[in-house]
UniProtKB/Swiss-Prot annotation:
Segments crossing the lipid bilayer: 512-532
Biological role: Essential hepatic enzyme that catalyzes the oxygenation of a wide variety of nitrogen- and sulfur-containing compounds including drugs as well as dietary compounds. Plays an important role in the metabolism of trimethylamine (TMA), via the production of trimethylamine N-oxide (TMAO) metabolite. TMA is generated by the action of gut microbiota using dietary precursors such as choline, choline containing compounds, betaine or L-carnitine. By regulating TMAO concentration, FMO3 directly impacts both platelet responsiveness and rate of thrombus formation.
Main subcellular location of this protein, as a coarse class: membrane
Catalytic activities: trimethylamine + NADPH + O2 = trimethylamine N-oxide + NADP(+) + H2O; N,N-dimethylaniline + NADPH + O2 + H(+) = N,N-dimethylaniline N-oxide + NADP(+) + H2O; hypotaurine + NADPH + O2 + H(+) = taurine + NADP(+) + H2O; (S)-nicotine + NADPH + O2 = trans-(S)-nicotine N(1')-oxide + NADP(+) + H2O
Protein name, as recorded: Flavin-containing monooxygenase 3
Keywords: Endoplasmic reticulum, FAD, Flavoprotein, Membrane, Microsome, Monooxygenase, NADP, Oxidoreductase, Phosphoprotein, Transmembrane, Transmembrane helix
Gene for this chain: FMO3
Organism, as annotated: Canis lupus familiaris (Dog)
Family that this chain belongs to: Belongs to the FMO family.
């Protein structure tokens, strides 16, 4: 084996990192503080300190063809959007098939990660771990941090005057597990993210009244998109990205808002974002609009102040006799085992080159995997991040100078503020980011060449969903089954829905979809030109 690599965390990022190390002949050792793999997706009856926590009813927001490991498709009969237990089943099968479990030390807490005295020459790290009360130290050639960012809850109590006076229950959404104990209660959920909306709509079936308080609003998308197909297989395409980047900003913004409002007018539901043209990550919830229509969930602005039993909103209205306040206010980014001078985290801004590498290390032997967020699935993103990180650790790929990396970070930060706003500085565009990472290791598909040599595949790659298999067509880790997986991805999408024979399942009409995408912006341009 080659260099020794420490991997912190055995969620999907950690598993991708173990596999990438093995593919490139490195020696991985993964430290996992719990007794099982899965990280965020491993449900527990109680929230555990230092570990991500989910509620019992969590389903994926990405469909199975878009969120698999790129050389390991889900079984045909798996549903397109999975319950957390189903995804955990897939993760377990993957880890066993790839023989990853033997590289994981369970129930092991990483206490500290420090540079060795000769780090500027060796690039090595001293890592102290603890298991069953016993501490041990070991030296590693590199470290991959895969501990996630849904661990340390953000509870902005100072932003809500009077909260300490409130006599009802008050807790972060990570503590929420199931709705039974809220029967007949009056509940205020603060935050309009995925967790806040999921919890609110679930509670609406048992609670007396549920209100969501939102500071800035949000786009709300459905998992069910055009003609009933999974949203991401229709929305996340290279062609759509090409249009977005090619059209004038005014046209691109208009088209984006039209897509977001296709299901319902957000203004009518009190959900409209303050700046609707920002590409902030939308909320995925199939129930919320219906709950608002039925009156079981109401949307209110930010809370101005609390009293002993009530919440006063910024519009002057009051929600009285509150039994419980649930803060779905996200998480803070922290690495308690690491000197903060290596990875700085302040005001949601972190200093990482491409969201992965600390730029000022003398040796590029540390990487953060799975930190970046995008309107795309986590698993393929972490897989590609890990593949590049391992190539850098091996020395096969090199990083730019510190100056160039810092300039890139500053440039990307400006772009992110423009597209996503101040609260989403870890967010990025999915396809652009994936292509950038893939180009570093020679895994980016050559679209023009594909049109010349394999037009059938090229059409699916460019106009169809940008599925993970595309990034295993070429380069290190190339998968011989990638081409067939791309050409059969719609078959696997339709298979679990074929539970009653009513004719042949229909794949999407790509031509009709493309016409819809292309013609409307053209018509808008024509009308715009006619009016000036």
């Amino acid at each position: 084996m080659g260099k020794r690599v420490a991997i912190i965390g055995a969620g999907v990022s950690g598993l991708a990192s173990i596999r990438s190390c093995l593919e490139e002949g490195l020696e991985p050792t993964c430290f996992e503080r719990s007794e099982d793999i899965g990280g965020l997706w491993k449900f527990s009856e109680h929230a555990e300190e230092g570990r991500a926590s989910i509620y019992q009813s969590v389903f994926t927001n990405s469909s199975k063809e878009m969120m698999c490991f790129p050389d390991f498709p889900y079984p045909d009969d798996f549903p397109n959007f999975m319950h957390n237990s189903k995804l955990q089943e897939y993760i377990t099968v993957f880890s066993k098939e790839k023989n990853l479990l033997k590289y994981i030390q369970f129930k092991t807490l990483v206490c500290s990660v420090n540079k060795r005295p000769d780090f500027s020459v060796s690039g090595q790290w001293d890592i102290t771990t603890e298991r069953d009360g016993k501490r041990e130290s070991a030296t590693f050639d590199a470290v991959l941090i895969c501990s996630g960012h849904h661990v340390y809850p953000n509870l902005p109590e100072e932003s809500f005057p009077g909260l300490k006076l409130f006599k009802g229950k008050c807790f972060h959404s990570r503590e929420y597990k199931e709705p039974g104990i809220f029967k007949g209660k009056r509940v205020l959920v603060i935050g309009l993210g995925n967790s806040g909306c999921d919890i609110a709509t679930e509670l609406s079936h048992t609670a007396e009244q549920v209100i969501i308080s939102s500071r800035s609003g949000s786009w709300v998308m459905s998992r069910v998109w055009d003609d009933g197909y999974p949203w991401d297989m229709m929305f996340i395409t290279r062609f759509e990205t090409f249009l977005k980047n090619s059209l004038p900003t005014i046209i691109s913004d208009w088209w984006y808002m039209k897509q977001m409002n296709a299901r319902f007018k957000h203004e009518n539901y009190g959900l409209m974002p303050l700046n609707g043209t920002l590409r902030k990550e939308p909320v995925f919830n199939d129930e919320l609009p219906a709950c608002i229509l039925c009156g079981t969930v109401s949307i209110k602005p930010n809370v101005k102040a609390f009293t002993e039993t009530s919440a006063i909103f910024e519009d002057g209205t009051v929600f009285e006799a509150i039994d419980c306040v649930i803060f779905a206010t996200g998480y803070n980014y922290a690495y308690p085992f690491l000197d903060e001078s290596i990875i700085k985290s302040k005001n949601n801004e972190i200093t990482l080159f491409k969201g992965i590498f600390p730029p000022k290390l003398e040796k590029p032997t540390m990487a953060v995997i799975g930190f970046v967020q995008s309107l795309g699935a986590t698993i393929p993103t972490t897989d590609l991040q890990a593949r590049w990180a391992v190539q850098v650790i091996k020395g096969t790929c090199t990083l730019p100078s510190v100056t160039d990396m810092m300039n890139d970070i500053d440039k990307k930060r400006e772009g992110k503020l423009k597209w996503f706003g101040t609260s989403e500085t870890v967010q990025t565009d999915y396809i652009s980011y994936m292509d950038e990472l893939a180009s570093f290791i020679g895994a980016k598909p050559n679209i023009p060449w594909l049109f010349l040599t394999d037009p059938k595949l090229a059409v699916e790659v460019f106009f169809g969903p940008c599925s993970p298999y595309q990034f295993r067509l070429v380069g290190p880790g190339k998968w011989p089954g990638a081409r067939n997986a791309i050409l059969t991805q719609w078959d696997r999408t339709l298979k679990p829905m074929k539970t009653r024979a009513v004719g042949n399942p229909q794949k999407p009409c790509m031509l009709c979809h493309l016409v819809k995408l292309f013609v409307l912006p053209v018509l808008f341009i024509a009308v715009f030109l006619a009016l000036i």
